[in-house]
Amino acid sequence: MRTALLEVGLEELPASEFYNILEQLETRTRELLKANRIQCDSIEVFVGSRRFGVLLRGLPEKQEGFVEEKKGPPLNVAYDSKGAPTRALEGFLRKNNATFEDIIEKDGYVYISRKIEGKAVEEVLPEVFEDLVMGMSFKKPMRWGTGEYEYVRPVHWIVAMLDDRVLNLTLFGLRASHVSYGKRYHSGALKINTPEEYYEVLKSGYVMASHEERKKSVLKQLEDFERTYGMKVERDEALIAEIVAMTEYPRILVGQFDQKYLELPEEIIVTAVKHHQRAFVAHKDGLTNFFVAFQDGPQSSENVVKGYERVINARLEDARYYFHKDLEMSLGEMNERLKGIVFQERLGTLYDKVERIVKISRKICGELKFPEDFTEKVLKVASLCKADIASKVVYEFPELQGVMGRIYALKEGMDEELAFAIEDHYSENPETVIGSVLGMADRLDTIVGNFAIGNIPTSSKDPYGLKGKADTVFRIVRKNEWDVSLEELLNFAASLVGFHLSNDLEEFFSSRFYQFLINEIGVSYDVARAVNHLWKKPLRGTLAAEALQNISERPEFQDLFVGFERVHNITKKHDSREFDGALFEKEEEKRLMNKFFEVKEKVLKALERLNYEEALQYLIELKPYIDEYFDNVFVMVNRDDLRMNRLGFLKNIDDLFMMIGDMSHLVKRT
């Protein structure tokens, strides 16, 4: 078996493209090998800050062969009445360079059928590698030189090998070779004799090509630090991923900032160290003044550590100044300053937005029938929930929006529960009821406001993150089990910005509810479609989806499905619900009517208690009565009064089912 290597060497990749490239390499390599009929024992992809590529192990000598079939003329055209080949058949064979031995007959036609041998793998791999490299997509590609080429970053070298031979491949005007390059300023050209030695050769040039190896190295160095210093470092996965993406030879650095800054709230210190310097803070019976960073390369680290310490101390000195200046103002005074900060063009200032949040929060509390004293607490927090945006610390560290609101509120003596809600309302999954009310109100205002001024997301663009905000609204409703009318809340929020519930807005929430049910509740696509019309009452829609999903996995699902299907199919074009039981002629009609009234009462009571599983069980009881009805009653009779009466009656049954879901969307389970 054979081994192949592709490495594309570029200028430094942006960290934001790292995992995009990694995912594409894994997916496209597998797809291209399959499309070219090349078996492979293992596919190893690698991405570094200056390179990416694949290592293929266990390749065959050649592609798999295949049988090619090409359709020719019909039999009655290919042969004359005596069975002799016609000129049409001869021309077909000549055109395809085939012989009579290649002919088969199938479905009344002549076909050429012949086995095509696979090409040698060294002939095919250059095409595979070219398709792989040139078929990748990037968020912001760039041009270089004369502008002839466009790619994620300028390409400087290509390595393409099969065993010890260089493949015939040219990309971006560069001919492939067996020469790679190590760490900039620390290593020159690196000759690769075979793909098998690739990783070790690059290590000699201070490059860990494997991102998995770099991650293991980072974690090992963090463990060594903890063991040596007796401290703990929080494993921030996002930060670790960023370090893995930005370094090719990560090496730990240990530094200290001035102890006087430990008087600052821990959140400020962590943000200054982690978010702004990509370093970890260390704990030992609380936060210490130690930090851990990673440099790229083997160079002496003393000057680098001093550089980190200088920058972090400067950032913390600024933060300390801003923090103490902020403490000279109350949250109420900060809130007044929101009058000078624009929220969005045509949607007013942040102060205007806060006023709308207060009003929407009151509406939500009213819908949920919260006690007045609790509502007053909600509104108190709502009126201050954006105040910290006017603070100096948040201006310098935007990541602390909400966090500083909580800290300043506590400094003013606000109850801890209320102070935490200021931070909590920013969460995509708020922990508190107050945070949930504010989070929902805030997001409804943002979504409706953007639709009002024409900022409508598309399938590919959502610059204001409205899809995620809608998902959070549904998440809040489900978590808190709030039986609210989203339609009513949207209409109210829209009225505050001179808007209305448009078709675009309805379709947006309907589509997000569908995705929410699939991605977060975990129901199947057909179940999500069945209840999607219930998005205006999202708790009920979610509970209906969960109940339908559960019953669809049980034997009685067939009874439910068939019962609905028989009623729904005959009534879907009928609108009237009017019927008169006195016009029923057959006992089967009367029995179904009596059972329907009995079941309807039970179903409505179950739905009032939000027990959709119980409601479905009651609906199943209708199945034998529905079967008996259709076996003995002809609905579409010639008499208009009887036909309309029967359809009106059945439409009532259909409506009862539809309160839980449109089961015509459900796929029959076997």
Swiss-Prot record:
It holds the Pfam family tRNA_synt_2f. GO terms for molecular function: arginine-tRNA ligase activity; ATP binding; glycine-tRNA ligase activity. Its main location: cytoplasm. It is an enzyme of class 6 (ligase). SUPFAM superfamilies: Anticodon-binding domain of a subclass of class I aminoacyl-tRNA synthetases, HD-domain/PDEase-like. One of its GO terms (cellular component) is cytosol. Keywords: Aminoacyl-tRNA synthetase, ATP-binding, Cytoplasm, Ligase, Nucleotide-binding, Protein biosynthesis. It catalyses: tRNA(Gly) + glycine + ATP = glycyl-tRNA(Gly) + AMP + diphosphate. GO terms for biological process: arginyl-tRNA aminoacylation; glycyl-tRNA aminoacylation. It comes from the Bacteria. It is found in: Cytoplasm. Its EC number is 6.1.1.14. NCBIfam families: glyS (TIGR00211). Belongs to the class-II aminoacyl-tRNA synthetase family. Tetramer of two alpha and two beta subunits. This is Glycine--tRNA ligase beta subunit. It comes from Thermotoga neapolitana (strain ATCC 49049 / DSM 4359 / NBRC 107923 / NS-E). The gene is glyS.
